[in-house]
Amino acid sequence: MSPPIIADTGGLLRALARTREGAPSFQDYEAALTSASVIIVPGLVLAEVDYFLRDSRAAMRKLAAEIFDPGTRYEYELPLPSDIVRALELDARFAQLNLGLVDGTVAALAERRRVYRILSTDRRDFGALRVGPRLTRPLELLP
C-alpha cells in the first residue's frame, strides 16, 4: 500500500470511470486510488462529485456507500471552520489561480492533515500552489 491520498473531484471521477465493458477508463488514476492506504474525501469534493454524477445516480449511491462503509479505506472529512478560513486565505494569496472554495479546502485539508499527495486532474492549480506556514510545501500530484 502507498501512503494516504486526498481525492479531488476530477481525480476521483477519473479513478471511478469505467468503460462499457467495466474496465477502468483511466488505469493510472484507478491504480493511484486502489493502492492508497487511505483515501480522504473532503466533504465539498463529495458534493461536487454528486453534481457531476447527477445523471448517474446509481454510481453516486455506490460511491457514497463505499465512502461511509467503515470497512473501506475511505475517510470522509468535513471541512472545519478553520479549513474554510484557510481556503479563503489560500485563494486570496494565490489569486491568479482562482482556486475557489473546493480546491482551497482540499489544500487546507492537505496542510492540516499533512497529507500532501493529491489525486487530481488539476495540474495547473495544484501544481503552482504551496501550503504550510511559509507556503513552501508543494503538493504531490497523482498520478
Residue ranges and their predicted role:
Residues 37, 73-75, 139:
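Short, conserved active-site loop motifs that form the nucleotide-linked donor/cofactor pocket
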Residues 44-79:
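Active-site-proximal, substrate-binding regions of enzyme catalytic domains
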Residues 1-41, 53-65, 136:
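Short, well-structured N-terminal submotif of metal-dependent ribonuclease cores
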Residues 5-8, 41-42, 99-101, 122, ...:
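Histidine- and aromatic-rich ligand-binding microenvironments
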Residues 12-13, 46, 126:
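A generic structural signal for short hydrophobic patches within well-formed alpha-helices
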Residues 75-121:
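Active-site neighborhoods of divalent-metal-dependent phosphate/nucleic-acid chemistry enzymes
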Residues 2, 112-143:
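Acidic, PIN/NYN-like endoribonuclease modules and their adjacent C-terminal/linker elements
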